[in-house]
Amino acid sequence: MEKQNIIEMEGVITESLPNAMFRVHLDNGFDVLAHISGKIRRNYIRILPGDRVKIEMTPYDLTKGRITYRLRKR
């Protein structure tokens, strides 16, 4: 798959929803519904409210995204 039309943004998890879905507040002020990518799910990386994450979104639907990375806390 080509990644030429992917939009990558950072945000903070605000709410944990059923079926591994999360509500994410992006740095630009928008809220997005996001699910976990396969690599995060396979490696059992725990994502909790308050964590900073990187999200990939498609330009066709800017209300949904995929969590690709959990940023480390300082």
From Swiss-Prot:
Residues 1-72 form the S1-like domain. InterPro entries: NA-bd_OB-fold, RNA-binding_domain_S1_IF1, S1_domain, TIF_IF1. One of its GO terms (cellular component) is cytosol. PROSITE patterns: S1_IF1_TYPE (PS50832). HAMAP family: IF_1. It comes from the Eukaryota. NCBIfam families: infA. One of the essential components for the initiation of protein synthesis. Stabilizes the binding of IF-2 and IF-3 on the 30S subunit to which N-formylmethionyl-tRNA(fMet) subsequently binds. Helps modulate mRNA selection, yielding the 30S pre-initiation complex (PIC). Upon addition of the 50S ribosomal subunit IF-1, IF-2 and IF-3 are released leaving the mature 70S translation initiation complex. One of its GO terms (molecular function) is translation initiation factor activity. This is Translation initiation factor IF-1, chloroplastic. Component of the 30S ribosomal translation pre-initiation complex which assembles on the 30S ribosome in the order IF-2 and IF-3, IF-1 and N-formylmethionyl-tRNA(fMet); mRNA recruitment can occur at any time during PIC assembly. The keyword Protein biosynthesis applies.
